[in-house]
Every structure is written in structure tokens, then in C-alpha cells.
């Protein structure tokens, strides 16, 4: 079939070899460049040939898609797809978020990484080099362009339509005309607007957006292709005079050189579009911009046809497009070549793509391995390239890897108008060889809660990936210093809690996006409290209950939440079964005369908990979230009511409630649920309110002797 298509394609090409040639030049302009699609559609519908194409920035994207056989319908479908928004926003599809390797969330604002290059040399990396995370673009440009690069052998003259794009060499202050090599790299360089998208290296030259020096490459069209007629589409303009209070206009004038957007009448026709209200990333306005370009071209069609006498049959164009697309080599990878990693690190990286050396794997395997490697932050960036070998009909996968610096300092916390303010500090060391390892020492300081924790982690790239973690932690709660909110009878609570524990955990991936975790730990807990609200601080001392516990657990965890706190998309789910055994000791603060200490009481119990939180988009701006939580514990009562309640299960769905002691939301068995109506202004701001209901299955009543009673009326909370 391919041979037949090729025969007809060459036959058709022979008839037009000496015919009038038409070149299409597309300017840059960000999302405004979607106008170009409407122009191409109008030209094709009227049988106007497009023999050559040159473009800059967004013009390079549209031009390259057409040059490798995309029809206007194909381009529209691509730009409308959910994938496209993820590509330019840097967000990862939920099914590729490898939760097993993700670090546990921490309240850090800043994570400053550095490395001791020499004995005393520290290299901090604080500011990002681009607004858009390149994690998606590094990979998707392989998916979009590598097969076309393979089909043309790296010669852009051999694409469906011969193509050129422009990038900028800011060091030598000149434009770069890209006519060969990796098509994805060429287009990526041409669109890398400074500070928005990360630049890439081409032949050891850092290449930026081509619009800096040549945003409308008619000169390249004339010099490289010599067409008889040029049709130009201009959706940009030279920067206006900078304004004192407009930082963007100042940057544009510093970065962008003036471009000649005209075409002499003797050479062709130019269509100029002026947009004052379209921003760089307004890709959701595709239909509007497409229609503007389409209608303008139709209005000028008589002028275009008077200059372009040759016509091409639409069926012939579709046939040539089909021939070219059918000859794109399918993705099948075998060998992996890695730059920027030592031999041990290379072995670790290769295990993510295939188990055996020279084993063939697919693009889907590449995609999953790519996101898995970037999930645990051992590697800061991976730039993949697919290099085609025509003899084996396979691709070599070339990976340019940048390892994360070994040391990090973290700073963060929680800022509130209440007394629940927290400061978070942490330091960490990480290293990757045959396996990845990480050591972290961090903690929080606050009026109510204080904590210090040492964590060590080792991840093994076995056939079933396995993670080992060791945690040693010390924390204190002082509930007396809490704020008195949302309660009719909020009496002072002179309670405090100290916790110390060590824990060993083993984690395995579970299903597509979850983690199974097994743990064994030992802890010492100490609760200090007064059983009466009438206290003489000169004489009375707090009662104390101490616990020495050995515990084991198995848990299943999964999350696709889009933020660490106040999420608007995704879900969080936890199912945990725990077994504890240990001893409890009670010491009264003011023992009566003749009091003898009670012996330590042994306790053993089972505890099972489940929690799920999920968010559903109900409209462009409205999201509805919900959560459900349930707890069952077979734990017996402690020596007294207060000790029992301090060790009971706690429903604390909000940041503030986690730092409060509220007996109304404590029980050994309970169910709870909540809804969260959210109005989303943008990615940074939202209005939300949360409503919760809580029902203890067997409420604990403060009687002469502790008793479980029948279920009581529900308690409610709102925030």
C-alpha cells in the first residue's frame, strides 16, 4: 500500500515541478498565532498551494505542524485537547503522577538546593529559569516531532512541506536559521520566550525565542526557497514606547528587536492582524482567533488568486499528506544513552524503562518511566531525544539528565490571625546511585505545636520497587494556648501532650496511583491534664498518664490533589489498619494521703480508619468538594474520663482544628462527612467554605464510671 501511495505522490509532484511556487510566512505572537490556522484552512479550501513555510515562535509551531502533515482539523484538535493545556502549563496527567515516589507534603515555602562543588564552594539555586515548568514540554516534543525528524532524516527540506524556523542566539546577538537537525528542538527553541519557557541548547548554543531578532522571516523565505509569491500572516507588532509603570513593556523593549513586518507588493501579500486584548497564553480563544484569520483570508481571496494562478486539488493534497504520515516510523525504543549521570545512576535510570539491556519498549513505557524518575526529586530535569536507526527500524533514547543538588534547606510554616502560627525549618541530603537515598532533619516551632523529626529513606529499583523509611520523632502539644472559637461552652483546657516514637516503614506501589505501606514502631506518650476546671495553680499539679506502646500497621494511600492545602481538583484516600499493645500508667498530680501508685495497665487494641476527600468541577468557576471519614477502635477506657478523651480518635478536618482540643469531636468510633463549595477565581485565588457533620457511634460520657452510651445528637463545624 505504501509503495502505491508513493508512486502516485511522485507522479503528482512531477506535474508541479516547474509550476508557480508559493511560500507562507507566519509571525510569532503567542496565542494570537492561532489565527494562522484559519488562514491555512482558507487557502486549502480555495486550492491555493503552500509549497514552503517559514515561521517564528507560535508561527514555527503552526508551520511545523503543517510541514509534517497536520491538516487544519488536526491542528485544531491538538490545540483543543486537554493534553495541550497540560503541555504549556507544566501539569502532569493524574495517571502519570507516581504517588509511590512522591515525598510526603511539608509546609515549606522555599526549598533552596545547593552543592559543595569544592571544599567550600556552595552553589545556591533559588530562582527558577522559567515561569512554565518544562517537565511536559521536554517529553511532548519527542511525541510530536521525533517521528517526523526520522522520516525526513533531519533535513527539513524533506518534510511534507519544506520548512524553516527562527531562534535567537542571545550571546552573539543574532538570529539562528534552523533547517536541519531535530525538528522538535528547532521548534522548541523558536518558541522559548524569555522567562516564560526554558531555553534549550542547539549545537552548544543557548537558543531563545526567534522573535527577539526576527519575528517575521520573509528574508529567510526568499533566501532559502525563492518562491514566486509570498503570503504573510502577521499577528504581532513591534513593542510600543515603554511606560514607567508597565514592567512588561519595559522588558519587551529590552528584549525584542524591531522587525520589518511588511512584504513588498512585488513579492506577495501580507495580512496584518492587530490584537490588544489577547495575552500570550490565551489558547482558550482558539475558535475566535481561527475565525478571524479564516474570514480575513476569504475577504482577500480575490487578491490572492490574482497573484497565485496555480491551483492544487484538495484530494491530491490529502493523498500527499496520507503518504507522508504513513511513512512516519512508529515508536519502538531499544538502546538508552544517558548524559549527565555516572554509571551507577545510569543503571538506576535504565531500570525505569526496561528490565533487560536491549529490551524493546514503547513510547508509553518511556512516558511512565520519565514521570516516575522525576517524581522523587532526585533528578531536576530530563531532556529526552529519540534518534532513529533506519536499519533496525528502532529508536535510540538519548537522555540528557540534570541531577538535583545533594543538599537542601527548607523554610516555611503557617501564617494565621489566630495563635496557630507555625515556623517550619528543615535540612536534607540526598544521593542517587544504584538506589536513591535521602536523609532529612526538620521540625516546626509554634505556640501550640512543636516538633523535631529525623527521617531516612532508601528506594530500591527492584522488579517491584520498594521503599524503606525510618523515622524518629519528638512532638509536643499545649492545648491551653489555643484560641477559643466556634463553641458555646469553650472552657479553658489545661492539657498538654508529649509524643516520642521511632518507626520503620516499608512501602510498595499499589494499583496505578497508590501506595501500600507496612510499618512497625515503638512510642512513648505522656498526657498532662487537670480533671477539673477549678484549679489553684499555687497548689494543684496536673495529673499524668503515660503510655509505652508497640504498634504495627498496614495502610493504603492514594492522592491526585493539585495542591498541598486547599485543593480544588483530584482526590485523597487513606485506609489504615493498626494494632497496638503496651502499658498505661496513671499518676495523680495531687495524691491523697495514703495513696499507692496503681500498677501499669496493659492495653491491646485494633484500630481501623478510612478517609476520602474528592473534588468535582461543576462549572468553569465552581467546584464541589466532599470528604468522608470513619474510625473504629477497640481500645478500652483509661484511668479517667480526661485521659480517655485525650487518647480517643479525633476528627480534625481543618488546619485550625488539628491544633485544638475539643471533646465534642473525639470518640473511639465515629463517622463524619463534609462538603466544600468552592468558587475558583484563578489558580491562585478562591472563595471556599466548608461544612462538616460528626457523629460518635458510641459517645463517651463523663459519669461516675466511664460508660459508652447510645448515639447522641450530631455535632457540626464550619469554616
Predicted feature residues:
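Single conserved hydrophobic/aromatic residue that forms the stacking wall/gate
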Residues: 708-718
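C-terminal outer-membrane beta-barrel translocator/porin domains of Gram-negative envelope proteins
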Residues: 549-682, 687-689, 699
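Gram-negative/organellar outer-membrane beta-barrel architecture
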Residues: 364, 369, 375, 381-561, ...
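Sec-dependent N-terminal signal peptides
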Residues: 4-13
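Short, intrinsically disordered, charge-balanced linker/junction segments flanking boundaries
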Residues: 110, 700-710
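Patatin-like phospholipase
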Residues: 18-56, 64-371, 375-380, 386-388, ...
